[in-house]
Amino acid sequence: MACVLAIGSILFVWILGKGKYSGAQLIYRMATNFAISQGCCLVTCACELTEEIKHLHTRYNGHYWRALKASFNLSCAAFVTAILCYVFYEPKLMASLPLTIDITLTLLSWLFCWILGIQGPTPATISEITEIKQLNVAHGLAWSYYVGYLQFVLPALKESIQKFNEENHNLLKFPETCRLHILIPLSCRLYGDLKDVDENITFLKEIPPLYIDRAGIKGRVFKNNVYRILDEDGRPYNCIVEYATPLASLLKMTDIPSAAFSADDRLQQTKLFYRTLKDILENAHELQNTYRLIVYEDFPETKDHSRHLLSQEILKHIRQQHSEEYSML
């Protein structure tokens, strides 16, 4: 359809301008219109860059070059055209054209951009559209995790902890430990036992399971585990910890060629999963003080990376919650 419109526009300009304007004048005007339109796009991209810089660490890991590439999608053809217009400028080329021809030439320049793929949405714009319209993989995973799991488990957590404490001498006696601590590693690597990744974390016990009839399964079981975590001085802390299981899907997608899902895509989707889940839970006011999201980087770039990263991250959040509880008293 774009090619048909382009051919029609060329014929229209040729009919109206035949014998009145030279081909050089018409081409020069179309080139200047193209350069001006690309200049407007350049300003728009600069505005997008200022917005992306605000999210430099959450979206691009602090890399300015990645933010720059995501914000700009201009072809070198725009700059070459602008230079050629300047080099070959002559007053006679800037003829005063009728409004109909001028508008048609402007339309024609946009059509050529579209046909040749010179102008298109930037990666940042595409990301914004898919995020707003909830077209990302992460949105579906976050909502599925909430409506299919957290929406059942979190409201019942308080009662399950009470039963657990009655049977186990109040092992979870502090408010900051009576929450479900959800681990969100940016690498998406999940382990069956947390001790496999950090020897300062050991499985202690299960809290009483939750049974729900769901999706044709009678008495479907939802379990949560209590882990004992040792700090740097060997002092024990007990809390309920588990991974956000949908992250395993993101990791598997990277290994499936047909998914066309790169490691960078996985990282961006993991961050979006966290932001989406955070928004969902914050809007579920009845679930306040029943969970804690722990997002952390677990792909070390240096050899002196701590072997106790996970226990340190969990303890940091437990202490933060303790100070928050204390400040509210």
Swiss-Prot record:
Task: Specify the protein's topology with respect to the membrane.
Answer: Multi-pass membrane protein
Keyword presence, Nucleus: no
| Gene Ontology CC terms | autophagosome membrane; cytoplasm; cytoplasmic vesicle; endoplasmic reticulum membrane; endoplasmic reticulum-Golgi intermediate compartment membrane; Golgi membrane; perinuclear region of cytoplasm
Segments in the Lumenal topological domain: 26, 89-98
Q: Name one GO biological process term.
A: positive regulation of interferon-beta production
- Give the transmembrane region(s): 5-25, 27-52, 75-88, 99-116
Molecular function (Gene Ontology), one example = proton channel activity
Q: Which reaction does it catalyse?
A: H(+)(in) = H(+)(out)
Its annotated compartments are: Endoplasmic reticulum membrane; Cytoplasm, Perinuclear region; Endoplasmic reticulum-Golgi intermediate compartment membrane; Golgi apparatus membrane
Q: Where does 2',3'-cGAMP bind?
A: 144, 149, 220, 245
| Function, as annotated | Sensor of cytosolic DNA from bacteria and viruses that promotes autophagy. Acts by recognizing and binding cyclic GMP-AMP (cGAMP), a messenger produced by CGAS in response to DNA in the cytosol. Exhibits guanine base-specific ligand recognition: binds 3'-3'linked cGAMP, 2'-3' linked cGAMP and 3'-3' linked c-di-GMP with much greater affinity as compared to 3'-3' linked c-di-AMP. Following cGAMP-binding, promotes the formation of autophagosomes, leading to target cytosolic DNA for degradation by the lysosome.
Subunit-structure text: Homodimer; forms a homodimer in absence of cyclic nucleotide (c-di-GMP or cGAMP). Homotetramer; in presence of cyclic nucleotide (c-di-GMP or cGAMP), forms tetramers and higher-order oligomers through side-by-side packing.
Family assignment? Answer: Belongs to the STING family.
- Which protein, by its recorded name, is this? Stimulator of interferon genes protein
Q: Which organism is it from?
A: Xenopus tropicalis (Western clawed frog)
Q: Which gene encodes it?
A: sting1
